[in-house]
Swiss-Prot record:
A motif ('HIGH' region) lies at residues 39-48. It catalyses: tRNA(Tyr) + L-tyrosine + ATP = L-tyrosyl-tRNA(Tyr) + AMP + diphosphate + H(+). The lineage of its organism: Bacteria, Bacillati, Bacillota, Bacilli, Lactobacillales. It comes from Oenococcus oeni (strain ATCC BAA-331 / PSU-1). The gene is tyrS. It is found in: Cytoplasm. CDD domains: S4, TyrRS_core. This is Tyrosine--tRNA ligase. The keyword Lipid biosynthesis does not apply. A motif ('KMSKS' region) lies at residues 227-231. Catalyzes the attachment of tyrosine to tRNA(Tyr) in a two-step reaction: tyrosine is first activated by ATP to form Tyr-AMP and then transferred to the acceptor end of tRNA(Tyr).
Length: 417
């Protein structure tokens, strides 16, 4: 199966500017291709990972990926998918974001076999007169107004700055084609108009038969119709500073049976036979969650590395078995970062007072005593039934945490101050 057919089987293609032309090109040569990354945040998120995964598939097949960090276009603001004008960030903020995202890309693609460039390097040198003479004359206002990204904003209003964004992105593609022989741009579903502008610019400046193509990925929806890529805590970031590898792992492990096979196709590098085998397990042995475990392992390995997979798996097994006393302090900090949390003093404390602190765990002393007597309270892995018991916060986890469980699954964390 060639790479285009594989991407179609995986459901990873929304549109192409010329599918047959692209397929024919790929049969005869290895190409360079690119994805643009917007540095308006310190980290990319799981939605950005879909086109990057396509780039990785091309890299694995011997093609050469190029990542364009939008240090220039990001300062202008992409109107795609936005209902209102973006707030422009200071250049020093962009510079920091560009640096962080560059490191994230290196983790995904390795140190060799790909290239990262910043479009600020060429866009910043483009003066207004050259912009208007060399490029502006090649773009029809009528066509630009019909692009979805512009048409959807005409009612609410769009600035000239954002209106010209598609020209700047087109200049990116032309520059990369001319200087680095890039022949394919990959982007999100909302980027099709911008990508088409780039292909058209190359055809006008180089020739109508020039082999330059665009490919977009679909908007990924869950089986319930909601947009994939959000959790209760917000975006699923790829930077471990904003979302721990364990939480990242858990996000994928917690996907439903209805969604997991689709996600295996889009986000993993497992082959068709392996995915179909996992699909059979979802159908015949869903309680084992083998497909979810494999999905979590594969995507976490791609983003954070094998060591992170092993650590996440270890924490998951310990929590599943209820053996929290075997966790290290650093593992506790990661595994319980999202549970209800209280702060306690660095001194021995009455167990009932601990349970009613800030009314987070128990609402009353009566309820706390009742749960203790009924064996419903576990502290640091040990069941506590003595209503007069005393807890020493220095005994476990380097004196930093106390883990409280009420019932079978409800966890709380006390941070020792």
């Amino acid at each position: 199966m060639d790479i285009i057919e594989d991407l179609k089987w995986r459901g990873s293609i929304k549109q192409t500017t010329d599918e047959s032309g692209l397929a024919n090109l790929l049969k005869h040569k290895k190409i360079s291709l690119y994805v643009g990354v917007d540095p308006t945040a310190k980290s990319i998120h799981i939605g950005n990972l879909i086109p990057l995964t396509i780039l990785k598939r091309f890299q694995n097949a011997g093609h050469r990926p190029v990542i364009v960090v939008g240090g220039g276009t990001g300062m202008i603001g992409d109107p795609s998918g936005k209902a209102s004008e973006r707030k422009l960030l200071p250049k020093d903020v962009f510079d920091e974001n560009v640096s962080r995202i560059t490191k994230q890309m290196t983790r995904l693609f390795g140190k060799d076999g790909f290239e990262i460039v910043n479009n600020y390097d060429w866009l910043s040198k483009l003066d207004l007169i050259s912009f208007l003479r060399d490029y502006g004359k090649l773009f029809s206002i009528n066509v630009m107004l019909k692009r979805d990204v512009v048409a959807s904003r005409l009612q609410a209003g769009i600035s000239f700055t954002e209106f010209t964004y598609q020209i700047l992105q087109a200049i990116d593609f032309y520059t990369l084609f001319k200087e680095k022989a890039v022949q394919l741009q990959v982007g999100g579903a909302d980027q099709y108009g911008n990508i088409s502008s780039g292909v058209e610019l190359i055809h006008k400046l180089v020739g109508p038969d020039t082999e330059a193509f665009g490919l977009t990925v679909p908007l990924l929806l869950k089986s319930d119709g909601t947009k994939f890529g959000k959790s209760a805590g917000g975006a699923i970031w790829l930077d471990p500073e904003f979302l721990s590898p364990y939480e990242f792992y858990q996000f994928f492990y917690n996907q439903t049976d209805a969604d997991v096979v689709k996600l295996l196709k889009i986000f993993t590098f497992l082959n068709r036979e392996e995915i179909e085998e996992l699909a059979d397990k979802v159908k015949n042995e869903p309680e084992k969650r083998e497909a979810q475990r494999r999905l979590a392992e594969e995507v976490t390995k791609f983003v954070h590395g094998q060591t992170a997979v092993e650590e996440a798996g270890k924490i998951s097994r310990i929590l599943f078995n209820g053996d929290v006393e075997n966790l290290t302090a650093s593992q506790v900090a990661v595994a319980f970062s999202g549970v209800p949390t209280i702060e306690v003093a660095d001194q021995k404390t009455d167990v009932v007072e601990l349970l009613v602190k800030d009314k987070v765990i128990e609402k009353s002393r009566r309820q706390a005593r009742e749960d203790l007597k009924n064996g419903a309270i576990t502290i640091n892995g040990e069941k506590i039934s003595n209503v007069n018991g005393v807890i020493d916060p220095t005994e476990k986890f380097d004196g930093r945490f106390i883990i409280i469980r009420r019932g079978k699954k409800k966890y709380f964390l006390a941070k020792v101050q």
